[in-house]
């Protein structure tokens, strides 16, 4: 069975932003979200549907390594109570809601997709997200594509490691600075072996990779155990 995996906060905040633009988010949020979800369901008919949510405390270990991690995000325009409450709509439409305690959705999606592929290697797995961090799930072979529901297209998967690339150039949206004085062109030269990092740059690169590379999450075994038990409860 093919699988559809939604990065729920990423997707649902997009629907809330559209509702905000109407001047009456409280009234229009759920109808807009329902329309978008039904459209996706029509696009991916016959797919098993998973809705993956961020949970409180999920960023803790990354913030311990980098106090700037996601510190620059302003979510004041969003009603998170309403966004979290929309999980009932997902359930009504046949999605299986997954909330791993103290876990970012990125990490949960990584493990969920891995488990789906382990159960059936021929299972086509599509992630719904605008988050380019999800590229690493595809590059690890755990998903087959990432659908950007705003641009209405699949995110391009680069030939180079997105984890290594972002560990060099940084990720402004997550507050990860990257290696100083090396831009995107320089990063490509590093990744293709045209130039090398010095020892100090390598240390910075590795510290950034600790944040970006989901495989370096020390809580991954616990996440895997939780999702295995969650799967058992759903079958």
Model regions and ranges:
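Domain-level signal for Mg2+-assisted phosphodiester chemistry and nucleotide/NA-binding surfaces
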Residues: 1-91
């Amino acid at each position: 069975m093919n699988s559809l995996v939604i990065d729920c906060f990423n997707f649902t905040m997009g629907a809330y932003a559209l509702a905000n633009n109407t001047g009456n988010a409280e009234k229009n949020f759920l109808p807009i979200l329902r329309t978008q979800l039904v459209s996706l369901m029509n696009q991916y008919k016959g797919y098993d549907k998973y809705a993956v949510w961020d949970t409180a405390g999920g960023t803790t270990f990354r913030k311990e390594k980098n106090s700037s991690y996601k510190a620059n995000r302003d979510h004041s325009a969003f009603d998170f109570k309403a966004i979290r409450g929309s999980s009932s709509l997902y359930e009504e439409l046949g999605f299986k809601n997954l909330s791993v305690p103290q876990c970012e959705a990125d990490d949960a999606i990584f493990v969920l997709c891995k488990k789906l592929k382990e159960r059936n290697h021929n299972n086509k797995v599509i992630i719904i997200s605008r988050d380019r961090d999800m590229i690493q799930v595809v590059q690890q072979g755990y998903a087959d594509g990432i659908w950007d529901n705003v641009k209405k297209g699949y995110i391009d998967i680069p030939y180079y490691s997105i984890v290594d690339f972002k560990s060099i150039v940084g990720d402004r949206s997550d507050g990860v600075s990257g290696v100083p004085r090396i831009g995107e062109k320089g990063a490509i030269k590093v990744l293709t072996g045209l130039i090398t990092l010095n020892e100090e740059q390598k240390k910075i690169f590795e510290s950034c990779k600790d944040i970006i590379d989901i495989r370096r999450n020390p809580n991954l075994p616990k996440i895997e155990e939780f999702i295995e038990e969650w799967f058992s409860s759903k079958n």
